[in-house]
Swiss-Prot record:
Full protein name: Probable pyridoxal 5'-phosphate synthase subunit pdx1
Pathways per UniProt: Cofactor biosynthesis; pyridoxal 5'-phosphate biosynthesis
Enzyme Commission number: 4.3.3.6
InterPro entries: Aldolase_TIM, PdxS/SNZ, PdxS/SNZ_N, RibuloseP-bd_barrel
EC class of the enzyme, as a word: lyase
Gene: pdx1
Length: 305
């Protein structure tokens, strides 16, 4: 696997920079999980910047268990035909053939996702070989930079998708922010040692120090269920928000979807966030993350190599 070089990361005409520029277009937006063309249209009308096409939302994947794979390409194409906004779809970690299929049918972004069953316990997909931008999850700076070195054009927190509990997304966002702040005052020798410590390419660690942030967009994901959740993640420095089960497992999906979009747009205005939070109907019941058991393979946020 050819890792991302410093030249690729900074050259505006490199394939990586072109793909990361496409992801930049989603900045400040909300990406919503959908399972039908009708849901996709609801998301688009609510102001979503993109949709994630799935056969089952994460809450149902948790509930029914079994092996979770890439969604049916025919179903994904139906959603692509139903909306004008970008369409994403998930593949299993390491399953490069699923990614080849999604690229072939024309999805706009591919999410190499821990929500699905892992296909390769040793390797992630070499994302630099694809024309389509990839999204990957992270829990800390090391994971984020390893995924970027493989070609990921967009990063998201892992959180705990399908729970409606935002605690892990908050933990992961704060962890990345803390580590970025930590390296700001490091000299070159310390940077070299720290890059080895977090198992990340030195060139990318230097780039993070220079920028004071990740070199790609960084979205919140996993457990975001309310306008307040979304606004909090934005105030923590996220570039946008993924919302899955929190919308279509709620009492009034269309109204909640619009409210979350407004909360992300006006995240620093408590008056607007308070207003859009009124009368949304029942939120998804959710699962307290503390009740999840690793032995049942339900703690998706722990999946990483």
């Amino acid at each position: 696997m050819e890792n991302l070089t410093e030249n690729q990361a900074t050259n505006n005409n490199s394939p990586f920079r072109i793909k990361s520029s496409l992801a930049q277009m989603l900045k400040g937006g909300v990406i919503m999980d959908v399972v039908t063309p009708e849901q996709a249209r609801i998301a688009e009308e609510a102001g979503a910047c993109a949709v994630m096409a799935l056969e089952k939302i994460p809450a149902d994947i948790r509930h029914f268990g079994g092996v979770a794979r890439m969604s049916d390409p025919g179903m994904i194409k139906e959603i692509m035909n139903a909306v004008t906004i970008p369409v994403m779809a998930k593949v299993r970690i390491g399953h490069f053939v699923e990614a080849q299929i999604l690229q072939e049918i024309g999805v706009d972004y591919i999410d190499e996702s821990e929500v699905l069953t892992i296909a390769d316990n040793e390797n992630h997909i070499d994302k630099s070989e694809f024309k389509v931008p990839f999204v990957c999850g992270c829990r800390n700076l090391g994971e984020a930079l390893r995924r970027i070195s493989e070609g990921a054009a967009m990063i998201r927190t892992k959180g705990e998708a399908g729970t409606g509990d935002v605690v892990e997304a908050v933990r992961h966002a704060r962890a990345v922010n803390k580590e970025i702040k930590k390296i700001q005052n490091m000299d070159p020798h310390e940077l070299y040692t720290y890059a080895k410590e977090i198992q990340a390419p030195l060139e990318l660690v230097k780039e993070v120090k220079r920028l004071g942030r990740l070199p790609v967009v960084n979205f919140a994901a996993g457990g975001v269920a309310t306008p307040a959740d979304a606004a909090m993640m934005m105030q923590l420095g996220m570039d946008g928000v993924f919302v899955g089960s929190g919308i279509f497992k709620s009492g009034d999906p269309a109204k909640r979807a619009k409210a979350i979009v407004q909360a992300v747009t006006h995240f620093n205005n408590p008056q607007i966030v308070a207003k859009v939070s009124e009368n949304l109907g029942e939120a998804m019941v959710g699962i307290n993350v503390d009740t999840l058991k690793d032995k049942e393979n339900q703690n998706w946020s722990t999946k990483e190599k």
